[in-house]
Curated annotation (Swiss-Prot):
Ranges for domain Radical SAM core: 62-311
Name of the molecule in the record: FeMo cofactor biosynthesis protein NifB
Functional description taken from the UniProt entry: Involved in the biosynthesis of the iron-molybdenum cofactor (FeMo-co or M-cluster) found in the dinitrogenase enzyme of the nitrogenase complex in nitrogen-fixing microorganisms. NifB catalyzes the crucial step of radical SAM-dependent carbide insertion that occurs concomitant with the insertion of a 9th sulfur and the rearrangement/coupling of two [4Fe-4S] clusters into a [8Fe-9S-C] cluster, the precursor to the M-cluster.
Recorded metabolic or biological pathway in which this protein acts: Cofactor biosynthesis; Fe-Mo cofactor biosynthesis
Co-factor(s): [4Fe-4S] cluster
Record NCBIfam families: nifB (TIGR01290)
Domain of life, source organism: Bacteria
Biological process terms in GO annotation: nitrogen fixation
Gene symbol of the encoding locus: nifB
Residue sites binding [4Fe-4S] cluster 2 per the record: C307, C310
Parts forming coiled coils: none
Protein family per UniProt: Belongs to the radical SAM superfamily. NifB family.
Residues annotated as binding [4Fe-4S] cluster 1: C76, C80, C83
Amino acid sequence: MSAPIISLESLTNTTSSGQLLTTAKSGGCASSSCGSSSRPTDMDSATWEKIKDHPCFSEEAHHYFARMHVAVAPACNIQCNYCNRKYDCANESRPGVVSEKLTPDQALRKVVAVANEVPQLSVLGIAGPGDACYDWNKTRATFERVASEIPDIKLCISTNGLALPEHVDKLAEMNVSHVTITINMVDPAVGEKIYPWIFYGHRRYTGVDAAKILHEQQMLGLEMLTARGILTKINSVMIPGVNDLHLIEVNKWVKERGAFLHNVMPLISDPAHGTSFGLTGQRGPNALELKALHDRLEGGAKLMRHCRQCRADAVGLLGTDRGQEFTLDHVPLEPHYDGAKRQAYREVVARIRDDHLEAKEKAIATVASANIRGSLQVAVATKGGGRINEHFGHAKEFQVYEASQTGIKFVGHRKVEPYCHGGWGEDAALAGIIAALDGIDIVLCARIGDCPKERLMEAGIRATDTYGYDYIEAAISALHATEFGTAPSQATA
């Protein structure tokens, strides 16, 4: 028997840690291992301790925990053809974009304010809008201030890797536990198509020479991080016709050098963003092309499939950016940190994630044991917590799962414009949603109206709210059983 539903949304909307814990305890916990680590059986305990509350390094954790980025590092030492940094932009959702640059003191003020209001917060990252290692003094000063005030928060940086080797020892000394390196090539001939120039050793390099230096520094930095036990995630931008097939080789190289995760992301090439690739017509991959590459990389370095390509000032759960709520004009001038609400939230999560893991593993095993050749591509509307708990019309993205002979796995997400605006459905938005759901067999959501349901059906996509508020994997297992006539894994409520 599973635990009664505890709504994470209602918990995080409470005003005090006491209310949060009272709500959690009223829900109870039926799992015999309530409060344990929920560690996957295929992972050692030391690694699990590092990732269990890091939403970017753990697909399971991203259902429960939030990250925030502080824009303290605007300077950059390379130019990428897919990047155009903007420092006062509120309406673009992509890396390299922020609403405002921060000093280390302003960053501390903002982090404390967010930690007091967002109990899911577990990670502070510096991801630009330039490069965290090149703009090192600001990165270091920010981490030192935050670690002194909120010692339990995980510290994380994202870097292009060019200046990484000279700072690895200091990163280890400051207990920076996770580092992301963007590596798009291991062949300089490919790299020169992506990077017009780099700035290294007080001079500018171009062409193959630039790409060769960048490659060597990236590999050295990765090896140094691995040797010091710092977990690394490799980000790669999939650029059709430039490096798409080459990323298979990149995956091999980074796995050999100890990368924990490889995150292959689609190129964002909207001309309105002003990037070189966008302005010259270089297209990004569609969702099916990205999935095909992900499938080819199975068996190599472990893949991250839940990346949202966040802004450099993102705040909140992945897929739910609350950054505009916490610009400097919205946060107190001198906030005082109170960790009680964050601690209470962690106790809540400990009560429910074991139940989720038990249901998830049972569902995956049930689908795999059915040994059915067919597969289902399922899009899910969710607010987090591992449940189908979002109204179709309110969804800003759909998480995509595949049920097949190997079980159930998360394979990506599709961003959309919400169908409902002010209580009314928008036909243009629905057309965009249907296009975004290309290749999907069925949509699972908490609620859906007859009109969008019928329009989806006309496009060959079924939708149902039958499994509303069930755990995602358990619902997919039950759905799979219905589709293929096998014994179901009972969906949990």
